[in-house]
Amino acid sequence: TGWRLGLIFAPAVFTAQLIKSHQYLVTAANTMAQHAAVEALTAGKNDAEPMKKEYIQRRDYIIEKMTALGFEIIKPDGAFYIFAKIPAGYNQDSFAFLKDFAQKKAVAFIPGAAFGRYGEGYVRLSYAASMETIKEAMKRLEEYMREA
């Protein structure tokens, strides 16, 4: 399903192994996908810029709001996720903290412990939602932290 078209940039030392799986995921690309790839690689260089700016705005808004509440955050430069340390003085059990938050404020984050033992005490959230949704989630988080 989907476009089934892919491109890998990797150090030569890895390509021999990568090609073993990559070739089966993207071979026999349909004509429409091939034309789309040509367009993207020749004329689409800046197509993602408006969305990139939007994601940066969302990320920075969340970081500002959450750090003001005491969360520790290392600013992400990759995908659209934030991994934030739960402030001292709050339940450090990420599952318990977020279960209570979800029950009281109807907002879902992912417990850091879901990513292994070193994730305990952290929460993960996505900023792939609209700014309106993000603002509402941050408002509810602020209310929750004040009430806890």
Describe each region flagged by the PLM.
Residues 1-148:
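PLP-dependent class I/II
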